[in-house]
Structures are given as structure tokens and as C-alpha cells.
Amino acid sequence: MPSRVNAMILAKNDTARDYLGIHPNLDLALERINDAFFATLGTERVDIIPGQCWCTKFTYDTIPDEESFFEAHEKFLDIHIMLSGSERVEVSSPKALTVFRSEPENDFWGYQGEGRVKLTLSPGEFLCVWPDDAHKIKMMVDHPETVTKAVFKIKVR
């Protein structure tokens, strides 16, 4: 098992099971990071345990950096899995950013600022961001492209 807990995870899909045991709700998602599960996803949210763990598939066009913003959560972590296309992502501590929107009832906070970690998420990879990881997603790599991604929402607090 990895020695770091509650830290951003960027890994290949075929290593997802290496992270089992960190949190029981996280295990429910990690066990489903595979092509067989992704093939069952339509456009509707799939509840694994209602209110605790679910997955939704999204298709959208990536956007310029300046049109994106950071988001963070207090109770839920996200796992972003690229199914087709690539997008740029930035991650930062919410403490290093400026909050511009607060929706506690939806476990959502929007932020502006500079990312500390910058990466490209491509098919075959997943990014797990914890409540302490503000994440800026949907950014184009070189030009706008249509991407498809699965996102797990997992209650950890």
C-alpha cells in the first residue's frame, strides 16, 4: 500500500488496485477503474452506494486556461479518469488560492489563482484529488478537443 494518504494520486488505470485499503469508500471506486465498468456507463449517474460513492461519465470540449477555475470539496474526493482525449489539470492547496464561490450545501468551493502542480491527464490514467486538493480541470493541451471522462465522487469525511 502507498505510504502517503490524503495526497493527490496520479497513476495508470491498471495500478488502481495498488491503492486499496486507504479508505473503504475509495476502494469501491478503485475496484471499478477498468474497461468493463467504463463500458457500462451511459450519461446517467451510477450510484455505487447512494450518497457515498457514485460515478458519472462526461463528454465536453476542453477550454483555454483563463476560462477554467479551481474547485475543492470538504467531504468528497474526486477521481478523474480520461476515457478519450487529453486535458491539462492543475492542483493546489485551497489555502494558496482566492475563494470566489462558496456552496457548502453542495460541497463546492470555487477558487482563482496559480496551480502548484501542473499535469496532462490522458487515456489510461486517473487522478485522485482529496478534499485538500483544489483542482482546475477541463483545460486544453494545445487546442480545444472533445474529451470523455469518468468521474467518481467519494465521501471520505
Spell out what each predicted region is.
Residues P2-T56, E67-A72:
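A short, N-terminal "cap"/entry segment at the start of jelly-roll beta-barrel domains
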Residues T43-P64, K75-S84, V91:
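A short glycine-rich, His/Asp/Glu-containing loop-to-beta-strand
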Residues T59, P131-D133, M139-V141, K153-V156:
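Short, structured patches in soluble enzyme cores that scaffold and shape functional sites
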Residues E71-H73, H135-K136:
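Histidine-centered active-site/metal-ligand motif
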Residues K75-L77, I81-E87, K95-A96, P104-W109:
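Glycine- and acidic-residue-biased ligand/ion/polar-headgroup-sensing regions
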Residues I79, F126-C128, P144-R157:
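A short hydrophobic beta-strand segment most commonly corresponding to one strand
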Residues F100-L119:
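An anionic, turn-rich surface loop/hairpin at beta-sheet edges
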Residues Q112, T120-M139:
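Conserved metal-binding segment of the jelly-roll/cupin
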